């Protein structure tokens, strides 16, 4: 399968913004990045079909309801590659629920039924298999095409995009998205789609995501006796730190983690933090999930 490397965001750099040109803001979704395209395989591999995959090229197998909704789009535009997020704002405080649906590689009938209820695809950009033909297409034109598209359904969602003309307007938008429960905001400039990091895509975020390795744990105390208290993690620079579970984990979840702790030790995990300390550690780190879905 020929996969596309998605455009990735830099942290906000105000010097990269030209306010004389179009600038757009979108809510930042705390979901799983997903690209969807039409691909022709050998008959022995099932022939032509729509595929959904992660930014590292891992195919998602529990999103048939989304792919079915996009059949008409890919019949008309087989060259397009949609870029978006597997997300549901009703699960904004339960990231692990999204992950549990996404990581199913051999979904059962019940898994697919649950995915139809909860899993949405939020589309915020697109590119094409023939990247060269998109070299001069800025985000304003791509956004116009997304806005006018008839592909949207209850499972395929349009991501709100608003043009802003000043840093104050961008900050106001960011404050509103936080108030609505989003994890941050994305700022887009009117630049072509780029595979890899691009200053055409910058993120406003009070908390940052990072990966580290779980090397140990502490058990819960008091009311949390019998559950996980926190993980002990080590980042790629060798910094060790305690990392308690974040939002979305209840008593039963934490007890289950403790009972199966060997499945976590040595694994890569995503955590959030507010900022780095002067000694290089992390302020307010919180465990999100194992990094085993991409």
Where are each of the predicted segments found?
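Short, solvent-exposed polar/charged micro-motifs at secondary-structure junctions
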Residues: 34-35, 91-98, 133-134, 166-175, ...
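N-terminal, charged amphipathic alpha-helical interaction modules
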Residues: 156-158
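Classical nucleotidyltransferase
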Residues: 26, 32-79, 84, 197-294
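Charged, flexible boundary elements
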Residues: 1-20, 25
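Covalent nucleotidyltransferase
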Residues: 16-152, 293
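Short helix-to-loop capping/linker segments positioned immediately adjacent to catalytic or ligand/cofactor-binding
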Residues: 109-112, 131-134, 160-177, 220-222
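Short, structured patches in soluble enzyme cores that scaffold and shape functional sites
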Residues: 84-86, 123-128, 160-163, 189-191, ...
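Amphipathic alpha-helical
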Residues: 160-208
């Amino acid at each position: 399968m020929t996969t596309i490397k998605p455009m990735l965001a830099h942290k906000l750099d105000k010097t990269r913004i030209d306010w004389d040109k179009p600038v757009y803001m979108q809510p930042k979704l705390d979901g799983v990045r997903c690209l969807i395209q039409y691909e022709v395989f050998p008959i022995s591999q099932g022939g032509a079909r729509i595929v959904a995959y992660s930014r590292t090229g891992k195919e998602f197998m529990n999103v048939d309801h989304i792919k079915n909704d996009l059949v008409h789009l890919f019949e008309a535009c087989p060259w397009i590659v949609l870029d978006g997020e597997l997300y549901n704002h009703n699960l904004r405080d339960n990231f692990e629920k999204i992950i549990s649906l996404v990581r199913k590689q051999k979904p059962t009938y019940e898994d697919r039924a649950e995915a139809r209820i909860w899993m949405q695809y939020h589309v915020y950009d697109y590119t094409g298999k023939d990247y060269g033909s998109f070299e001069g297409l800025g985000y304003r034109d791509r956004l116009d095409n997304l806005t006018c598209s008839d592909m949207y359904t209850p499972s395929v969602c349009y991501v709100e995009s608003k043009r802003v003309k000043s840093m104050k307007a961008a900050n106001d938008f960011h404050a509103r998205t936080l108030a609505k429960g989003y994890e941050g905001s994305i700022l887009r400039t009117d630049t072509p789609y780029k595979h890899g990091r691009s200053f055409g895509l910058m993120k406003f975020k009070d908390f940052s995501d990072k990966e580290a390795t779980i090397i140990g744990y502490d058990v819960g105390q008091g009311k949390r006796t019998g559950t996980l208290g926190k993980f002990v993690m080590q980042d790629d620079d060798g910094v060790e730190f305690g990392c308690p579970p974040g939002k979305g984990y209840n008593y039963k979840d934490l007890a289950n983690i403790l009972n199966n702790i060997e499945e976590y030790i040595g694994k890569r995990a995503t955590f959030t933090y507010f900022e780095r300390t002067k000694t290089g550690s992390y302020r307010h780190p919180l465990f999100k999930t194992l990094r085993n879905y991409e």
